[in-house]
Amino acid sequence: MKGYIVQIEDATLKNENYRQVLFTAKHCQLVIMNVQAGDQIGEEIHDLDQFIRVEAGEGVIMMDGQKHAVSDGFAAVIPAGTRHNVINTSSDGLKLYSLYSPPEHKVGTVHKTKKDADTDEHHHFDGTTSVA
C-alpha cells in the first residue's frame, strides 16, 4: 500500500513523545506531538504550510503576534512565512497532530522530549519518503 491509514485521534491521544513522524509522502507529512504542561514549541517560521489540530489539552497558538486560545477540536492553518508558536497553558500534555506541506522532518523522526528536538541538528527532511 502506498498510502497510510491511522485512527488519528487514538494515535495522538496515546502519544507520549514530544514529536513523532507517522508518515511522509512527497508533498506532505503527518506528525503527532505532545507538548508538556507549561512548555511551548518555540517561535518559528517555516517555508512550508502547516495544519495543526488539537486533540487534548488547552493552549495558545500565536500567529504573527495574534494570540488564539485553543483546546480539543480546534484547528489552525499556518501559511508559509507566518511567525508562529504553540504554547501549552494546561496542566496536562497538549496533544496535537500536524500536517506539513511539504514535509519538514526526516522519516522516522521521534523526539522523546523538546530538548531532544532542540539538540537534533539532523531531523530536517532529506527527501526520503515513507513510500517505497
Sequence positions of predicted segments:
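Glycine- and acidic-residue-biased ligand/ion/polar-headgroup-sensing regions
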Residues: 49-59, 64
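Ligand-binding loop in jelly-roll beta-barrel domains
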Residues: 80-106
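Short acidic-glycine-tyrosine-enriched beta hairpin
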Residues: 66-80
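A generic "binding-loop/recognition-motif" signal
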Residues: 26-28, 37, 47, 66, ...
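A short, N-terminal "cap"/entry segment at the start of jelly-roll beta-barrel domains
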Residues: 1-27, 111-132
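Conserved short histidine dyad/triad with adjacent acidic residue
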Residues: 15-16, 31-46
